[in-house]
């Protein structure tokens, strides 16, 4: 007989395995962004008073190097439908009612391990353990991914260090009163992702080869295509309108 907690873990493993090719491509792109960090810093310093030109040169660098700054968001975007489905499913799932797993007495409700005796606004009057574990896993996952992001921070872009602390904190507060089954899913999901990224980094990806490939790509003229071309064209149009407005 397979407990529902184990079933959630098995489902999470299947989802993560299906997502592994996307995770791999995303992590490779993050490595590329890390390699490009000195170039991006140089561009930011050179065009610190010209935001449009800075964006143009940055996008040109991404295109020539074969890097995609948005690739890190792809896994999260793909998982949005899964998250929405699970978010709607767990609290109302009758099959999970009164189904225990480890310290959780009911996977469709929160897994309180401590009653505080008083209420904390937006948090509750108890402490749930699965949200804490999920928050810790999210923190380390975010730390691993934001560590590959280029610095300095681009104007108008969110501060990644703030996000690194804000996301786990939001998880902790939001899920403390939510179904423990969902917190279990997120804990296992992020834990598996961390393990997968460690394996990719240490046993699959060769940073030296990636660096050499980027340097080779940067030396080749490459015509922008797709999203990069449209974005660069939009930047150029904005620059033209800006100049026209000054006349």
Short names for language-model regions:
Residues 1-247:
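Helix-loop-helix
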